[in-house]
Amino acid sequence: MSASAVNVTPGRNVVVVGTQWGDEGKGKIVDWLTDHAQGVVRFQGGHNAGHTLIIGGKKTILRLIPSGIMREGVACYIGNGVVLSPEALFKEIGELEEAGLSVRERLFISEATTLILPYHVAIDQAREARRGAGKIGTTGRGIGPAYEDKVGRRALRVQDLFDARTFADRLRENLDFHNFVLTQYLGGAAVDFQATLDTMLGYADRLKPMVTDVSRRLYEENHAGRNLLFEGAQGTLLDIDHGTYPFVTSSNCVAGAAAAGAGVGPQKLDYILGITKAYCTRVGSGPFPSELYDADNPSRQDQIGITLANVGKEFGSVTGRPRRTGWLDAAALRRSIQINGVSGLCMTKLDVLDGLDEVKLCVGYKIDGEDVDLLPRGAAEVARCEPVYETFGGWKESTVGIDSWDALPANARAYLTRVQEVAGVPIDMVSTGPDRDETILLRHPFKV
């Protein structure tokens, strides 16, 4: 190592995580922060969650590729903690290249990334259909079964594609197991070995130029003084360990997963930005203490909840499913802040609250008459929570596009001030619209 390399100040690493049940608006914020980053890293999840970006009025939905791909010159990394569908990846690459973006030269995929295969999708969909009314709400894209194979030590990884004979042997062994489950237990059709083998090996040459030792590359980039942004998918309350289990996703969505899922030392994570919507949403099944509206539940049809859904355009960017809506839950937010070690919050979609006569904030719960100030663990306990609210005056003025704190309506400032008091960490950013420039900056995560 040269003397000059020793003296380079390492770059800063910022982790962006959702503090709710996903859909907090992480994609826009990652894109905004990428002005100060030379690389963006996905470290968990798969193509089951979409990040929606509005840039210059044009809508782009990214499911697998990091949001930094929208910025020319920014490197994008898919870490070992991700589960990768080659079919979904190349579909997304094609869409981006059609839009005029260079992708393959800037995308780096960990050789240790787990592959999603056709039998994972088949099992995922067959299981969900079999559950009927007890469904979890999976997207049916094979994410969970792929993670099961990873934990069961039978997963096929990206690097396995480059040894055709070994890949074929392991695929045959896996199909023996999974086809038994599909046909004998789930009542589905078997997945064909040869067709699967041909399809997967067909991706090998296309993937190979993008495959690398991502962990080593991130280490070298950081020590060369380059800033890195770690982009989480889903949200803390969907985390496999810390969420409302079993109504959760199949990976760890918390900030600590950035270290394990990208192969970086945890002490290298300098700042954790918690993305928090100014109200709450949830897709699919599971408890939701502050819920106002659920399109599928006749008993949850509060007009304010309907307004939040309509004004906020609360439909899944990947599935198109309507999201359930409710007031911001600060007791759940506190749980997320503690788990993630959040340095500061970014409040998104504040403008959706414009025009309401009053705004409520859930500050705790009652369970059997007892006060509870933190979201309990596990779905059964969360389902027993009765929300305790504080009520604030609403504001009639539009907050859309406001880019300074002082320009916000007084009641909006009062609401946000109380949120950060209850949360115990500062609000460092506020998003007042979907476009990049519709952002209030109070403290910059890369400059704190």
From Swiss-Prot:
The keyword 4Fe-4S does not apply. Pfam families: Adenylsucc_synt. Keywords: Cytoplasm, GTP-binding, Ligase, Magnesium, Metal-binding, Nucleotide-binding, Purine biosynthesis. It catalyses: IMP + L-aspartate + GTP = N(6)-(1,2-dicarboxyethyl)-AMP + GDP + phosphate + 2 H(+). InterPro entries: Adenylosuccin_syn_GTP-bd (IPR018220), Adenylosuccin_syn_Lys_AS (IPR033128), Adenylosuccinate_synth_dom1 (IPR042109), Adenylosuccinate_synth_dom2 (IPR042110), Adenylosuccinate_synth_dom3 (IPR042111), Adenylosuccinate_synthetase (IPR001114), P-loop_NTPase (IPR027417). It is an enzyme of class 6 (ligase). The active site is at residues 23, 51. GO terms for molecular function: adenylosuccinate synthase activity; GTP binding; magnesium ion binding. IMP binds at residues 23-26, 48-51, 139, 153, 234, 249, 321. One of its GO terms (cellular component) is cytoplasm. NCBIfam families: PRK01117.1 (NF002223), purA (TIGR00184). Plays an important role in the de novo pathway of purine nucleotide biosynthesis. Catalyzes the first committed step in the biosynthesis of AMP from IMP. PANTHER family: ADENYLOSUCCINATE SYNTHETASE. Homodimer. This is Adenylosuccinate synthetase. It comes from Burkholderia pseudomallei (strain K96243). The gene is purA.
